[in-house]
Amino acid sequence: MAELATIARPYAEALFRVAEGGDIAAWSTLVQELAQVARLPEVLSVASSPKVTRAQVAELLLAALKSPLAAGAEAKNFVQMLVDNHRIALLPEIAEQFEALKNEREGAADAEIVSAFPLDGADLDSLVASLERKFKRKLKPTVEVDSSLIGGVRVTVGDEVLDTSVRARLASMQAALTA
């Protein structure tokens, strides 16, 4: 996975530089759409077929997009470059790295919150507000429920993990008692 990230990084950075000259949010939507299309096994199959020309693959990808940017020269050139270099399968990773660059520019970060119980609006807002103070940046939360945590939450922001779950505390106590 690390090597995919290494290969995808220059593409994401180049696209982000293009996006900085316009609407970054619109480019983010475009790259997310491209990533969704590239995840389809049928698209990867067509892209690797020797019977289909590179221009046809690029046209197929662009035709599947709803974004108005897809008609622009920059988007067409980007897609054609990916097709020519056999990098269509990298689009999900490129999209992920593009989002990371966008978040960095906005002073924001994605936060993965795993809770033992479902979080409703007020509880989630309160938790996100306190996490934003702790991490000193705007967070974009995604919430999952995992009852095996027993209680509490586990929050992942970038490479930082804050685990206040009962399961983690029990594991810590067990480690302390057996040491």
From Swiss-Prot:
SUPFAM superfamilies to which the protein is assigned, alphabetical: N-terminal domain of the delta subunit of the F1F0-ATP synthase
Keywords of this entry: ATP synthesis, Cell inner membrane, Cell membrane, CF(1), Hydrogen ion transport, Ion transport, Membrane, Transport
The protein's name in its UniProt record: ATP synthase subunit delta
Subcellular location: Cell inner membrane
HAMAP family, A to Z: ATP_synth_delta_bact
InterPro entries, sorted: ATP_synth_OSCP/delta_N_sf (IPR026015), ATPase_OSCP/dsu (IPR000711)
Gene giving rise to this polypeptide: atpH
Domain of life: Bacteria
Family that this chain belongs to: Belongs to the ATPase delta chain family.
UniProt function note: F(1)F(0) ATP synthase produces ATP from ADP in the presence of a proton or sodium gradient. F-type ATPases consist of two structural domains, F(1) containing the extramembraneous catalytic core and F(0) containing the membrane proton channel, linked together by a central stalk and a peripheral stalk. During catalysis, ATP synthesis in the catalytic domain of F(1) is coupled via a rotary mechanism of the central stalk subunits to proton translocation. This protein is part of the stalk that links CF(0) to CF(1). It either transmits conformational changes from CF(0) to CF(1) or is implicated in proton conduction.
Membrane topology: Peripheral membrane protein
GO annotations of cellular component type: plasma membrane; proton-transporting ATP synthase complex
Subunit-level organization: F-type ATPases have 2 components, F(1) - the catalytic core - and F(0) - the membrane proton channel. F(1) has five subunits: alpha(3), beta(3), gamma(1), delta(1), epsilon(1). F(0) has three main subunits: a(1), b(2) and c(10-14). The alpha and beta chains form an alternating ring which encloses part of the gamma chain. F(1) is attached to F(0) by a central stalk formed by the gamma and epsilon chains, while a peripheral stalk is formed by the delta and b chains.
Disulfide bonds: none
Pfam families associated with the record: OSCP
Lineage: Bacteria, Pseudomonadati, Pseudomonadota, Betaproteobacteria, Burkholderiales
